[in-house]
Amino acid sequence: MFTGSIVALITPMDDNGDVDRASLKSLIDYHVASGTAAIVSVGTTGESATLNHDEHVDVVMQTLELAGGRIPVIAGTGANSTSEAISLTQRFNDTGVVGCLTVTPYYNRPMQEGLYQHFKAIAESTDLPQILYNVPSRTGCDMLPPTIARLAKIKNIVAVKEATGNLSRVSQIQVLVDDEDFILLSGDDASGLDFMQLGGKGVISVTANIAAREMVELCALAAQGNFAEGRRLNQRLMPLHQHLFVEANPIPVKWAAKRLGLMANDTMRLPMTPLTDPAKRIVEDALKSAGLL
């Protein structure tokens, strides 16, 4: 369940900024039909930053309910306060989520020892499998391979989502981690195929929100070692990988999902604003290049 194409699911909202349950069901059904390996609910792409804790939990619980056991659900549970991250994580004990994705603390920029103690405390507070999440471009905090290796020794820390886009990190982590069952996942669609060729086991993907079948196929080709065919598919998807970040994520991907009829609105809460007209043209062209329009 922690390998292959895992979607970092967008959170559909109505015109008032409340969760659009009908669109959420439509998105989940789309991923079930497409063969997506799992859903990450309320991560960065799911707008965790603009949901309060009760709303955060509610979205995950609605996702679980609508998934109905058809697809595994991973809860995003990151915070820049350890006690807050523990509290949020514990709210998902015995709910049916298969694990938690926990981002490094953002803004306060802890030292490597602080990162170790943070994730260790979270893992020791629950039996749920934990996926570390390193995305320094957003958090201002880079969890280095030696710290990841230390954390990999903790029983229920089972994987890392590495979103630096730095492919040398794959081999650096592999050299340092003793546990061959520890899973490396790419958090960067544009370099995901190369990441898997170096030993990664999948992608936690933004692109999968709108190209679910294609990302499932890409990850399957990588798992089979068919990188020649995978590269051909990835070249077709590359404009999407890149231009879904033409403005801050998830602004472009929510617009694209609405454009493709996957959900009713591309509403976001402030400070996120609608996709600009010049960016719409760029994303539209990427959708056409990928064969989605």
Swiss-Prot record:
- Could you confirm whether the keyword Cytoplasm appears in this record? yes
Active site (catalytic residues): Y133, K161
Q: Where does the record place it?
A: Cytoplasm
Note the CDD domains from the entry: DHDPS
Q: Which reaction is this enzyme known to catalyze?
A: L-aspartate 4-semialdehyde + pyruvate = (2S,4S)-4-hydroxy-2,3,4,5-tetrahydrodipicolinate + H2O + H(+)
- Which pathway does UniProt place it in? Amino-acid biosynthesis; L-lysine biosynthesis via DAP pathway; (S)-tetrahydrodipicolinate from L-aspartate: step 3/4
Q: Which residues bind pyruvate?
A: T45, I204
Q: What is its main location?
A: cytoplasm
A GO cellular component annotation here is: cytosol
Positions of the record's site feature: Part of a proton relay during catalysis: T44, Y107
Quote the EC number: 4.3.3.7
Q: Which GO terms describe its biological process?
A: diaminopimelate biosynthetic process; lysine biosynthetic process via diaminopimelate
- What does the UniProt keyword field contain? Amino-acid biosynthesis, Cytoplasm, Diaminopimelate biosynthesis, Lyase, Lysine biosynthesis, Schiff base
What molecular function terms (GO) are annotated for this protein? Answer: 4-hydroxy-tetrahydrodipicolinate synthase activity
Enzyme class (EC, first level): lyase
This chain's function reads:
Catalyzes the condensation of (S)-aspartate-beta-semialdehyde [(S)-ASA] and pyruvate to 4-hydroxy-tetrahydrodipicolinate (HTPA).
Q: Quaternary form?
A: Homotetramer; dimer of dimers.
Name assigned to this protein: 4-hydroxy-tetrahydrodipicolinate synthase
What is the organism field in this record?
A: Yersinia pseudotuberculosis serotype I (strain IP32953)
The gene from which this protein is expressed is: dapA
